[in-house]
């Protein structure tokens, strides 16, 4: 064997030994334990959820949102409305809260909190409250780890910081479109249909001749989707358009839409005090279907 080959062989052996030894001396995950963020009995007692979520980095701005349980459902309450939360979202959220997961202890020193963005000024904070207004749990979610697969977390009853999986990321938001079903008429025409329409000076009764146009309007409204809620006081102007629909079950639906400078429209209906935002394009399509009926 040539001298150069022997040297390369020796170097290769040394590197292989170092590689093997690196596995023997890798930092251990000592202290890892399995638990859940909340116990199942506590999850069942949740009657109110208060969110404080960073919506902008430096300078940090916090977005606030409160979900309140009324009967079997949770609602997003604003000063001018009460919006039902999607049940499948709540079910998934509560399932994650009570699920077993691995906790890796990271720090027990509050002075380390800024390193994980888990201090009060940067963390996403969620408070769970009972019906009697006592606090069940308070959770603080910090930044993700370097790989993006884990997230730092602490509870309000402990100074310890843990690393858990990042399954909660989608829920760290106060964006209404995530929590609410904005297809507000998806189930309206189950078992009934539109029998009459009034729009401005335009008044039409459903007949065999225009039945297809009415059916097209029903189909459009079933897929009709708002882009957000409108939490300001009711808005009316000379440009507000109003529509009345007479339904086959003896009820009626009244709605109005008012243009904003942004190009979107504020949308109200008679079923509740809730107000929504719809896009200019959606409003154009709605008017097209209404005006096609004669």
Residue spans for each PLM region:
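Secondary-structure "cap/kink" motif recognition
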Residues: 1-294
């Amino acid at each position: 064997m040539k001298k150069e080959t022997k040297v390369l062989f020796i170097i290769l052996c040394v590197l292989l030994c170092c590689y093997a030894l690196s596995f023997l001396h890798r930092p251990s995950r000592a202290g890892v334990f399995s638990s859940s963020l909340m116990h199942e009995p506590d999850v069942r007692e949740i009657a109110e959820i208060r969110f404080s979520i960073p919506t902008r980095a430096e300078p940090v701005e916090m977005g606030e949102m409160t979900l309140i349980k009324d009967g079997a459902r949770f609602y997003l309450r604003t000063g001018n409305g009460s919006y039902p939360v999607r049940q499948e979202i709540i079910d998934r959220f509560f399932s994650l809260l009570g699920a077993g997961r691995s906790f890796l202890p990271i720090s027990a020193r509050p002075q380390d909190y800024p390193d994980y963005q888990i201090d009060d000024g940067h963390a996403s904070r969620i408070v769970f409250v009972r019906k009697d207004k006592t606090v069940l749990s308070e959770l603080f979610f910090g930044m993700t780890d370097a790989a993006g697969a884990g997230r730092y977390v602490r509870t309000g009853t402990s100074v310890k910081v843990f690393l858990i999986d990042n399954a909660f990321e989608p829920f760290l938001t106060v964006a209404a479109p995530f929590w609410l079903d904005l297809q507000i008429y998806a189930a309206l025409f189950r078992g009934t249909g539109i029998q009459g329409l009034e729009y401005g000076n335009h008044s039409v009764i459903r007949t065999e001749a225009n039945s297809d146009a009415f059916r097209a309007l029903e189909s459009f409204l079933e897929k009709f989707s708002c882009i957000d809620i409108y939490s300001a006081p009711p808005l009316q102007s000379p440009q507000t358009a109003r529509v009345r629909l007479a339904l086959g079950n003896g009820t009626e639906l009244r709605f109005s839409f008012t243009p904003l400078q942004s190009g979107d429209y504020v949308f109200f209906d008679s079923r509740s005090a809730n107000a929504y935002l719809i896009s200019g394009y959606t409003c154009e399509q709605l008017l097209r279907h209404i005006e096609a009926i004669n």
